[in-house]
Amino acid sequence: MRIELVAVASVVAALTIPIAGPAIEVRTWPVLTDAEVIGQEKIGDQVSFRVEAMRKRPSCMYQDVVAKIEQQGQATKTAEVETPFSGRRISRPPGRQYMGSWKVPKPPNPDGVDMTPGTIVTFFVRYQCHVLWDTMARIGPVRVE
């Protein structure tokens, strides 16, 4: 009987951890806290965003940034964000961090979006902290000025 209970518990854990693990990790052991967009700047026909956050976990490697873009009367879009570290894997020490310039690509890029005033942007920064799953940090939403 005891062996069966251990086997059932192992199966439940094996099925639950990959599903619930990322959500639990983000709440209990986040990579970034107090993250917010602290500035926007119009550069040509793009908007550049600057971000401030408190870095908590130095072992996590930066992967990329994705933006969820919501515009009035249009379907929600997702775009890979251009950052100074695009294409590079980096890790920063714990403490207050300033990040940017982050730019959402413009058309004709397939991910391109015209960032008009009133557009709502939410950034998702992806980190690799271990081999089980990627860890996400959410920043925003913020309204484009």
Residue locations for each model-derived region?
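Hydrophobic membrane-insertion alpha-helices, especially the h-region
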Residues: 1-23
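Short, compositionally biased P/S/T/A/G/V-rich stretches that sit at domain boundaries
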Residues: 20-44
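Short beta-strand elements
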Residues: 27, 127-145
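A broad structural signal for short, well-ordered beta-strand segments within beta-sheet-rich domains
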Residues: 30-37, 59-62, 118
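Ser/Thr- (and often Asn-) enriched beta-sheet segments in non-cytosolic proteins
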Residues: 36-38, 48, 99-103, 120, ...
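Contiguous segments within soluble domain cores/interaction surfaces
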Residues: 38, 42-99
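A short, structured loop/turn motif at beta-sheet edges
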Residues: 42-45, 72-74, 108-120, 145
